[in-house]
From Swiss-Prot:
Coiled coil: none annotated. A 1,2-diacyl-sn-glycero-3-phospho-(1'-sn-glycerol) binds at residue 142. It comes from Paramagnetospirillum magneticum (strain ATCC 700264 / AMB-1). NCBIfam families: lgt. The lineage of its organism: Bacteria, Pseudomonadati, Pseudomonadota, Alphaproteobacteria, Rhodospirillales. This is Phosphatidylglycerol--prolipoprotein diacylglyceryl transferase.
Length: 269
C-alpha cells in the first residue's frame, strides 16, 4: 500500500446539552423520516393519489414505530440472538447501535398493511409511495454509519480511496458505508423517481414496490462484497454474508411482485 485517505474522525455526538447527548445516528433517522415524509406528501398529491396529505402525517407515526421496533428486533434475531438471550435488558438500548434494515423493512411492511386496512386504502398504492421515499432514509443512515466509523469495508491495500477506520485495525479498508449510501440511497432513489414519472408504471399498483425490493436487494448483495462481515458471524453458506442471504429472498419477492403488477395492469381509479 502506498496511499490511504485519512478518515475524518467525526465526533459521533453532534450536540451535547448537559447530560443529554444528541448523536448523528439519531439525527440521521430524524432527517430520513422528515425528508421522506415531505417527499411522500409530494407524491400523493399526484395521481393515483394513494392517500391524502393528512393521512401521510398519520402514517409517519406508523412508519417510525415500524422502523425502530422492526429494525431493533431484526438485529436482535438475525445478528445476535444468543447475546441478547443472555442480555435481554439491552434489547431496548437502541442508542448503543444495532439496527437491521431487513427487520426495519418488515416493520414498515406490517405498518403499511395495518394502515391500509385501517384507512381503507389500496395496500400496493400505499406501499409504492412509501418505497419511493425509503432510499432517503437509507442514504442518511449509511452516512451516519460512516460518521460512527462502523460497518466498514474489507481490507483494500491497493485502493487509493481506502481508509484506516478506528476499530478496523491498521490496514486501509473500503469505505463501504459510502458505497451503500450511493447504491441503496442515491441510485435507488433516482431509479424509483424516474419510474414514478412514467404514468404507465406508477398506475400499476405494486410495480414500484417490486422495483424497490429487488433493487435494494441487488444493491445490498453487491455492496456486501466490499463490506467486512460481522465479526461474530463471519462468512456463512458458500462464503455469503448474512446481509446477502437476507437479500436473496427479498430480490425474488420483488421480482415476483413486479411481474404480478405488470401483468395485472393499471388498476381502475
Amino acid at each position: 500500500m502506498t496511499f490511504a485517505l485519512a478518515y475524518p474522525h467525526i465526533d459521533p455526538i453532534a450536540l451535547q446539552i448537559g447530560p443529554i447527548a444528541i448523536r448523528w445516528y439519531a439525527l440521521a433517522y430524524i432527517a430520513g423520516l422528515m425528508l421522506g415524509w415531505r417527499y411522500v406528501k409530494f407524491l400523493v398529491a399526484r395521481p393515483p393519489n394513494a392517500m391524502t396529505e393528512l393521512e401521510v402525517d398519520d402514517f409517519l407515526v406508523w412508519a417510525t414505530m415500524g422502523v425502530v421496533l422492526g429494525g431493533r428486533l431484526g438485529y436482535v434475531l438475525f445478528y445476535k440472538p444468543l447475546y441478547y438471550l443472555e442480555n435481554p435488558l439491552e434489547i431496548p438500548m437502541v442508542w448503543q447501535g444495532g439496527m437491521s434494515f431487513h427487520g426495519g423493512a418488515l416493520g414498515v411492511i406490517v405498518g403499511i398493511i395495518a394502515f391500509s386496512r385501517f384507512r381503507g386504502r389500496n395496500l400496493f398504492q400505499v406501499g409504492d409511495v412509501i418505497c419511493c421515499a425509503v432510499p432517503i432514509g437509507l442514504f442518511f443512515g449509511r452516512i451516519a454509519n460512516f460518521v460512527n466509523g462502523e460497518l466498514f469495508g474489507r481490507v483494500a491495500p491497493d485502493v487509493d480511496w481506502a481508509m484506516v477506520f478506528p476499530g478496523g485495525g491498521p490496514l486501509p479498508r473500503h469505505p463501504s458505508q459510502l458505497y451503500e449510501a450511493g447504491l441503496e440511497g442515491a441510485v435507488l432513489f433516482l431509479v424509483l423517481f424516474g419510474l414514478w414519472r412514467l404514468t404507465g408504471i406508477r398506475h400499476r399498483a405494486g410495480a414500484l414496490s417490486g422495483v424497490f425490493l429487488a433493487g435494494y436487494g441487488l444493491a445490498r448483495i453487491a455492496s456486501e462484497f466490499f463490506r467486512q462481515p460481522d465479526a461474530h458471524l463471519g462468512f456463512l453458506w458458500g462464503g455469503a454474508t448474512m446481509g446477502q442471504l437476507l437479500s436473496i429472498p427479498q430480490v425474488l419477492v420483488g421480482l415476483a411482485l413486479l411481474a404480478w403488477a405488470l401483468r395485472r395492469g393499471a388498476k381502475a381509479a
